[in-house]
Amino acid sequence: MFAIQSENYFVDNYSVSDLMMYPCVELNVEAAPTATTRSSEKSKRSRTAFSSLQLIELEREFHLNKYLARTRRIEISQRLALTERQVKIWFQNRRMKLKKSTNRKGAIGALTTSIPLSSQSSEDLQKDDQIVERLLRYANTNVETAPLRQVDHGVLEEGQITPPYQSYDYLHEFSPEPMALPQLPFNEFDANWASSWLGLEPTIPIAENVIEHNTQDQPMIQNFCWDSNSSSASSSDILDVDYDFIQNLLNF
């Protein structure tokens, strides 16, 4: 019992003695934040205010090179009357700004492309379907009602009308065949052809059926062969015939 009371008494005395012996502890605790704020104010750097000319030059250099070497950074700082650290920080901030803008644009593009086609109203979809059905019906009816043209083979043989897939005989159309002339056999040859064509009197009488049918089968070379032994044709007769023929030509 007494031990417990003594312990309680000791605790009470200790707590009271601490409060009485160290009365300035609270003052030190209150003074500590003021010292830290003063040190932070001293360490806080001032914000750099760039002029319009400096910003234009920095932006121009950023579009050319987003990352500067130290030699180039020193040149820019000397030309714009800035410190090397200011130029370095400005480029860092500018790169972060560009990165944020590109990420934002990419997010907006992803949202626009991710919109499903089902977002359209059902009425618009029905209208589109109806238009497609009408077009299909119109196309089918035109195909069915169009009659198939039957090509006349007789006309095609003459070379007047030809389908596009068939070869066209231009030579046959534009250069027709020569006019056929009647060909008379040798036995029916008119001996007085000059008199009939030129209007002259016949000099040699026409003998009918002079050449027999059996001689037609023989070659024509035998008719033109000259028989040296035959004396049927004399030189005087030949000269008379030739003279009369030449005289008729001269009179014409």
Swiss-Prot record:
Its main location: nucleus. Keywords: Developmental protein, DNA-binding, Homeobox, Nucleus, Transcription, Transcription regulation. Residues 43-102 bind DNA. CDD domains: homeodomain (cd00086). This is Protein zerknuellt 2. It holds the Pfam family Homeodomain. GO terms for cellular component: nucleus. The lineage of its organism: Eukaryota, Metazoa, Ecdysozoa, Arthropoda, Hexapoda. It is found in: Nucleus. Transmembrane segments: none annotated. InterPro entries: HD, HD_metazoa, Homeobox_CS, Homeodomain-like_sf. It comes from the Eukaryota. Required for the differentiation of the dorsal-ventral pattern, and does not appear to be involved in the process of segmentation. GO terms for molecular function: DNA-binding transcription factor activity, RNA polymerase II-specific; RNA polymerase II cis-regulatory region sequence-specific DNA binding. One of its GO terms (biological process) is positive regulation of transcription by RNA polymerase II.
